[in-house]
Amino acid sequence: MASTKIDDKVSIPGPVTGTGNSRFLIVSHENGGIWDLVRFGVWGNKESGDKFLHYSAGGGLLEEHLVRSDDSGGGDDRGGEVPDHRWVIFVSIIVRKLIAIFGKPMEWTGYLVEFFLNLFSLNGNFLGLLYNILHGKVVMPHRGSETFISAIGHLDGRINLYKSETLTKEIGEPDFWQKIGIGHRDLMDLCMMASKLAYENEKVVRNVVNLHWKMHFVDFYNCWNDFEKEMSTQVFLLCDKPKDANLILVSFRGTEPFDADDWITDFDYSWYEIPKLGKVHMGFLEALGLGNRTNASTFHEQLFVNNLKFANLENVHATIPPSESSKSSTSFSDSDAHTGSDLSSDSERPTDTRKKKFRLEIPERTAYYVVRSKLKRLLKEHKNAKFVVTGHSLGGALAILFPAVLVLHEEVDVMERLLGIYTYGQPRVGNRQLGRFMEAHLEHPVPKYFRVVYCNDLVPRLPYDNKTFLFKHFGICQYYNSLYIEQNINEEPNPNYFGMRFLVPLYLNAGWELIRSFTMGYMYGSEYEECWESVMLRALGLFLPGISAHSPVDYVNSIRLGKARSTQMSSF
C-alpha cells in the first residue's frame, strides 16, 4: 500500500499569520478491515497501521505521534510504551467502527423515538392518545415546530430557571461581575439550562428564552461541518434584555443521543497542531468549521487565511449603524450552502447594500466565524455587556475552543469582555500545551473557565488519557458525586473510566441512581420528580453506567441541589 503520509505543506500568497507546515495525526476507522486492525493492535504491524493512521510528512516518526504528548518541551512527560497507546487507538477504532455500523439504525431509532415521545406528549400520554384515536382528535407532531421537543428535552422537562428574577436583578447590579465564580449558582443554572435548550429547534428556543426566561432571544444558527457535509453544528445567542444588555450568552449544542457522527467524534483521537495553541482535537475543529481532514491544509486556511479575509469584512460591516446591524442572521437554507448568505431571525431581508455585500462575501457558514461576527456586533451595540460561553457534552468542547481561537486571533477587545466559560460533561479537547496557553489567558486575574463533571459521566473521560498520552483536561473541575456533593479538583476521579478497581463501584452506583430516581420527587419536591424516560435511561445505566450519567438531569440537579464537600466522602 502507498505511504499514508499526507503532505500538508501549502503555499498561500499574501501575508498570513502562522504556518502551513503544522503537524497532525488522523485516526481513520473506515479504511482497514478487522484483520488489519488485529495485526496493528496486537502485533504492531506498520503496514496495517498505515491503513488507519495518517500523519503529517514533517512530523517525524509515527511512534512520535503516538508516544509524545507534547513535543514543544516545557516539562511534559516523554516516552512511554508504544503498545500502550496502540491499544488505546485500537479500542477507539473498534468503538467507532461499531458506532458507524449502527449509524443508520441509530438515526432511524432517533426519529421513531422522538416521534412517539412527542405523539404521547401532545395527546396526554398513552391513555390520552387512545382517547384521541377513538374520537378522531389525534394531534400529530411536526418536527421543527414550537411544540416538537427533542429526546433530551423529554429526559428533563424543566424549562424555568432556578431563580430567574434574582438573576435578572443581580445582572443589572454594578458589582455583579465581582460576584462571579464557582459558587454563583444562578449563573451556572442559566448556563446549564441554555446548554440543554441548545438541543431544541429554533422555535422552541425562542419561546423558552422570551416567554419563560423573560430574556431576549438573539439568533439561532445551523452551521456547516465540511467534513460531515451537513449542517451539524447548532448554536444560539441570547441577551438578558433587548436594549442596554448586561449579559450575552452563547450556547453550543452537544452530542445528540442518536447521532452516530457526534459519538464518533467524541471517541476520535485525531489531532491538529496549531502554532501557539498546541495539539487540538481535529473533530472539534471541524465542528467549528475550521477545517476538513480530507485536506489537512484547510485547517491552516480556515484558521489564518480566512481570519484575515473575514476580519476585513467585519471592519467593513462595522461602518453600518448599530440599528441596522442588529438585524442578524440565523439558520441557513440548503440553497445558500456555498454563498454564505442567510436570513434574519424575523424573516426580513436587509435592504442596506453594504450589508448585503457583507453577507454574500462571508467565506463559509462556519460556526466560529458566524458566531464571532455576531458576538462582536452585540458587544458593540451593548456597551456594558459581558458574555459567557457554554455547552453540554460536545457543545462544551466547542464552548472552550471558541474563545481559544479568539485568543489565537488576538481578539483582545472581545476577550476583555469575557465573563466566563461554563462547560458540562465536556470531553478533552487538546494537549498540555493548549491547557497552559488557555490557563494563561483564563486564570488571571480571576478564573473564568469552569468545567462541571457529574460522577461517572463517560464523556469527560474521552478521549482516553494517561501520563504520557496526548489529551489532557485543564482548568477548574467542579465535580459532583451521586449524592450531589460538590468538590473542586484538578481532575475527576477515575479519569479514564476503565479499570478493574472502578468496575464494581460503577455498577453499584448505577443501581443506586436507578433507586434514587424513584425518590427524588419525595425528597426534593415535584420539580425533581423524574419522568419515565429518565428512569428508563437509568435502567440502561445498569449496562452502560457512563451513558446514563451523561444525562442533563443530573447536571441540573447538581447545580440546584449541590452541597459543598465538608468531610471526606466517597465519590460513590
Curated annotation (Swiss-Prot):
Motif GXSXG location, chain numbering: 391-395
UniProt-recorded Gene Ontology molecular function terms: triacylglycerol lipase activity
Consequence when changing S393A: Reduces pollen tube growth
Subcellular localization: Lipid droplet; Membrane
Keyword match Transmembrane: yes
EC main group: hydrolase
Biased composition annotated in UniProt, kind: Low complexity: 323-334
Gene3D superfamilies reported in the protein's UniProt record: alpha/beta hydrolase
Active-site residue numbers: S393, D457, H550
Membrane topology, as annotated: Single-pass membrane protein
GO cellular component: lipid droplet; membrane
Cleavable signal peptide: none
Basic and acidic residues composition bias: residue spans: 346-356
Pfam families: Lipase_3 (PF01764)
Tissue spec. comment: Expressed in pollen grains and pollen tubes.
Transmembrane feature ranges: 110-130
Enzyme Commission numbers on file: 3.1.1.-
Keyword terms of this UniProt record: Hydrolase, Lipid degradation, Lipid droplet, Lipid metabolism, Membrane, Transmembrane, Transmembrane helix
Reactions the enzyme catalyzes: 1,2-di-(9Z-octadecenoyl)-glycerol + (9Z)-octadecenoate + H(+) = 1,2,3-tri-(9Z-octadecenoyl)-glycerol + H2O; 1-(9Z-octadecenoyl)-glycerol + H2O = glycerol + (9Z)-octadecenoate + H(+)
One of the GO BP terms on file: lipid catabolic process
Function text: Acid lipase that can hydrolyze a range of triacylglycerols without a clear preference for acyl-chains. Can also cleave 1,2-diacylglycerol, 1,3-diacylglycerol and 1-monoacylglycerol, but not phosphatidylcholine, phosphatidylethanolamine, or sterol esters. Required for pollen tube growth. Triacylglycerol hydrolysis by OBL1 may provide acyl groups for the synthesis of membrane lipids in growing pollen tubes.
Similarity annotation: Belongs to the AB hydrolase superfamily. Lipase family.
Family annotation (PANTHER family): ALPHA/BETA-HYDROLASES SUPERFAMILY PROTEIN, TRIACYLGLYCEROL LIPASE OBL1
Protein name, UniProt field: Triacylglycerol lipase OBL1
Organism of provenance: Nicotiana tabacum (Common tobacco)
